[in-house]
Amino acid sequence: MNKNLLIKIENISSGYGSTVIVNNFSFEVEQGQILTITGSNGMGKTTLMKTIMGLIDAREGKITFKDEDITNSSPDYRSKSGIGYVPQGREIFSTLTVEQNIMLPIYTRKKLSFSPEDKLEEIYSLFPILKEKRFADGSSLSGGQQQQLA
């Protein structure tokens, strides 16, 4: 095996419930290498990171870290081995709907210089995915969608 290989992800698949979010994804990172994973909101970047961390079980595939198969190891073990990531920052109420999360700070203001409904439509025009998911709980959104909501 390559002595410089830090992490190897082989054909990983994971998701939530019956929904597969990450499907047959593979990559390798060598010591000192920087890897950027990009994609649109809801494409599985956060799910992939949570799978590598062991916060979500891999349905298929293998995760190797420093020549050790860690696919079935606990999140605690992975953390102690040196695997970690900084999650996306977001402050939302996970039990409120998207629309309730948007409207809450508007309705808590004493004086408004605008129509709450107009402000809501303005926000939806900037973030169409939020309008599409306006009745969904905040916790059901992807990490990127939660960040937009915040």
Tell what function each PLM region has.
Residues 61-69, 81, 114-120:
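Conserved ABC transporter NBD signature motif
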Residues 95-103, 134:
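Short coil-to-helix segment of the ABC ATPase nucleotide-binding domain corresponding to the Q-loop/switch region
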Residues 38-40:
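The feature captures the beta-strand-to-loop junction immediately N-terminal to the Walker
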Residues 3, 108-125, 132-139:
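Short coil-to-helix "N-cap" segments within the ABC nucleotide-binding domain's helical subdomain
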Residues 53:
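Helix-to-loop junction immediately C-terminal to a conserved catalytic motif
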Residues 35-36, 85:
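Short beta-strand immediately N-terminal to the Walker A/P-loop
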